[in-house]
Amino acid sequence: MLNLKIRSARIEDAAILAAAERTIAETPGLLVSRPSELILESFEEKIVELSKIGRYVVAQKDGKIVGHALLDPMRLAAISHVFRLTIMVHPGFQSQGVGEALMRNLMDWATRTPQVGKIELLVRATNERAMRLYTKLGFVVEGRFRKRLRLPDGEFVDDIAMAWFPDR
């Protein structure tokens, strides 16, 4: 993707990030959160928090935010080397290299950051495109959470647990 820039998220990005996630959440099964559960203050707090203890980045194309991703460390000492990855490619920008660029940025940061020993993520079993990308980038399947997400129509979707270990 041409003109793609990855940068650290800023507090003034929070409204755009929240709005994008609300739009994505309108499609059942894409996110765990429902649109009404995605509030601006939570995004602002997460941006501030991860600027100190993790990483929160946005992808911009021609100045417009088109995706975002974060690495959030686990809080308990015994698993503090494990960082949870969350990634969103905003509507209309899938299959254009945004997700891969965000992932590579986070993985590069993780490789340079000694505190990161493992990155974990969950992906819907129905999201084959994302699973192919994660596998291409070196993530491995660690397990399956059956019937983890209940859709509004009562159906269930499995989540696949994947992980990546930085080379040092």
What is the predicted function of each stretch?
Residues 96, 100-101, 112, 125-143:
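Conserved active-site alpha-helix within GNAT-family acetyltransferase domains
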Residues 83, 117, 124-128, 147-168:
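C-terminal "cap" of GNAT-fold acetyltransferases
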Residues 11, 30-92, 103-104, 109, ...:
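Acetyl-CoA-dependent GNAT
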Residues 110-122:
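Conserved GNAT acetyl-CoA-binding A-motif
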Residues 19-35:
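Helix-loop element at the rim of GNAT/NAT acetyltransferase active sites that forms part
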Residues 17, 59, 89, 102, ...:
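Hydrophobic packing within well-folded, soluble alpha/beta domains
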